[in-house]
Amino acid sequence: MHTAMHNMATDWDDYSRSFQSVMPSQMLRLNQEVASHMRGHVVDFGCGGGKIIPFVLEQPLVTSYAGIDAALEMVRRARWMGEQFPEKPSRIVHGRIEEVVVEKADSALSINSYYNWPDTRLVLEKIGQLLKPGGIFVLATISARLDMKALLQAAQKECVAHPHWAEFREHNLRICESTSIRLLELDELIREVQAAGFSVDEAHQHLYEGGLSLLVLRKSQHRG
């Protein structure tokens, strides 16, 4: 792994404890909405600590779940999360999205991972290869309109007593202060996913006070 990629994975390892345990209501609503689109075998690209696993596995049409993440500590925590909900099978793979081999997905998701991908077009094309024809892919990522300070200030009212809240807040502030992340306007993101071969069923910015783009995408029935 290149040094830059190693440093990013290390940063996510440091974030893993607070990320998994702190769930502001805005994040809860996001997980619930994304999970509602899932069916069959689900693949989560950039699964982090697996916070969405219980929301996905409770969907009646979902049969199984696989998560992929490059940060080893996130992977460990996601595996633990899957073990807490054993009614349906889950599998967590350690690696970069563009390099792993997993079973093709009936539906797929990626939440707040896109902005950290070193080559977004390459990763989107890989996701397309791992999605069955006609499959749904829900892509959710913070946008150029995000006001992280305001979002965290609102979340503090409900999370301030959580023992990992301060750690969660500081890491999220650092994310948005980074010059290496990729934040697009919604129309820019739509053009990129279309160029990668996806059609757009839905697109909105209703969550995170307008600072998150959520796209419901579909792979053509005619693509392999």
Task: Give the label of every model feature segment.
Residues 107-120:
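A short SAM/SAH-binding and catalytic strip from SAM-dependent methyltransferases
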Residues 121-133:
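A short glycine-rich, Lys/Arg-flanked "PGG" loop and its adjoining helix->strand segment in the class I
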Residues 1-38, 40-48, 51-55, 138-165:
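Conserved class I S-adenosyl-L-methionine
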Residues 98-108:
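A short acidic, Gly/Pro-enriched loop at the edge of an enzyme's catalytic core
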Residues 49-99:
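Class I SAM-dependent methyltransferase SAM/SAH-binding core
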Residues 180-196:
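Short alpha-helix
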